[in-house]
Amino acid sequence: RILPAVGRNDRQIDTSSLAEDTLTTFKTQLGGRKVVFEPYAVVHAEEPQRIRDLWKQRLRWARGNVQVTSRYRHVFFRPSRVHKLGKPSFGIFWFSILLLPVAMILSSVGLVGLFLLHSELAAVVFRAMWITAACTYVYTIALAVQLDGRTGLRSWREAILFPGLISIVVMITAFFPGLLEKQVPALFGVTLGPQFEAGWTLFVYIWISLAMVGAWIAKLVEGTWIGRFLTPFLIYLVGYGPLLCAVTMDSYVKELQRADAVWDKTEKIGRVIG
């Protein structure tokens, strides 16, 4: 009863957006129906085996979310008695994901600006930002493992390395200032000069944006002879999170260019794991 009611021509799901599932959810709630989240639902979904296929899949979803945002821009942050899509909490949650790449770039620009102005506020903002990111990361991983322990045990390496090895190092730097650039070298009788310290500081300030560039390079070289080894290495360095943010950034570009909204599906292999 619900799908025909929210579909097109009263017969099918509305596929005018590349994120037809999100669009259906929005139309369901806007029609006064309640959408209930079922955390233990079993889903048989095909996972892309290559980065470029994952990029293609997620780009379609990301572009669809941008389209949904544009179509229902009048709904966000406008509370209603009919639905909950206008609640401020939902709007903050929605745009914190949709605009995350923009926030990452702006944070890097702001931190570098404060650093060049020799402001002590740069270190405070850096630590607050990355400690918050670390706590969110730990909470998300713990919640995911709790909801699906079997998959969590099978993919524990990917879960731990979701933010990337370098980002984990940056998190350690935020929690323990001076540990990696002063205390650890001192154990080996090495003293790093002020130039290294300044360079390291700049690196950790811009890394949150640089990681997206690294993810794009990993996708770019995957089809080359060196990509067989370099792409997995880069993904573990930069992380799956920055990869998804890079895809979201690509979705901005594609929508601004008014690229063709086609269902560019990935190759199906039909392999069952687990």
Please place each PLM-identified region on the residue numbering.
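Juxtamembrane C-terminal module of membrane proteins
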Residues: H74-K84, A123-G274
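Non-transmembrane catalytic domains and loops of membrane-associated enzymes and transporters
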Residues: R1-L114, G270-G274
